[in-house]
């Protein structure tokens, strides 16, 4: 978790460099860097407003159709459709009227609306069941293949299909490779 916060420069590295696209993140314009990197945290934030309002925090100009498409990718559309007011359903401050897994899926959809070049998922599917997690990962592979995805997870199943898996233990690299390796 601390390591990935160096990518959008929430913190700067005390030594060494962090590179995105081969460029030191300190050489990027901070606004540009943060526009191109989306983070979804395990503990996420929803605001008072409709589901659409909350999704549009990712892109204020997103059409309803774009919001629905990203909600489908994040497996949020299936529960949104069960609400009487669908995408116009009111969300309480902090998302107190939706479950933890629903909050996570809404914040994933919101991050996808930004169309980031780098998507950081920090234990962001920990509150969803493994079947839904698998659907989300499949949608990522099929629908946003050009986006770099950095996934921090406790469940092996959440990262087993990753191109590279980095195992850290007390801040040290303990393993690097594919799941099969």
Report each predicted region and the residues it spans.
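Conserved catalytic segment of ABC-fold P-loop ATPases
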Residues: 161-167
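A short, proline-enriched helix->beta-strand linker immediately N-terminal to the Walker B motif
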Residues: 113-117, 146
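Catalytic Walker B motif of ABC-type/P-loop ATPase nucleotide-binding domains
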Residues: 119-122
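Helix-to-loop junction immediately C-terminal to a conserved catalytic motif
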Residues: 7-8
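Conserved catalytic loops of ABC-family nucleotide-binding domains
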Residues: 142-153, 159
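ABC ATPase "signature
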Residues: 176-177
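ABC ATPase nucleotide-binding domain helical subdomain, centered on the C-loop/LSGGQ "ABC signature"
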Residues: 17-19, 27, 34, 52-93, ...
């Amino acid at each position: 978790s601390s390591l990935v916060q160096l990518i959008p420069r929430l913190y700067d590295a005390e030594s060494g460099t962090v590179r995105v696209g081969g460029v030191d993140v300190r050489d990027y314009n901070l606004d540009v860097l943060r526009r191109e990197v989306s983070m979804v945290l395990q503990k996420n934030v929803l605001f008072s407003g409709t589901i659409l309002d909350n999704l549009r925090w990712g892109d204020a100009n997103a059409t309803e159709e774009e919001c629905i498409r990203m909600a489908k990718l994040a497996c949020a559309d299936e529960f949104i459709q069960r609400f009487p007011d669908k995408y116009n359903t009111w969300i309480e401050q902090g998302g107190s009227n939706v479950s933890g897994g629903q909050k996570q899926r809404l914040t994933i959809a919101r991050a996808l609306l930004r169309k980031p070049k780098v998507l950081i998922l920090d234990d962001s599917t920990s509150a969803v069941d493994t079947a839904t997690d698998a659907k989300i990962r499949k949608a990522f592979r099929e629908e946003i293949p050009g986006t770099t995805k950095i996934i921090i997870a406790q469940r092996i199943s959440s990262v087993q299909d990753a191109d590279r898996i980095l195992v850290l233990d007390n801040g040290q690299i303990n393993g690097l490779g594919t799941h099969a390796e």
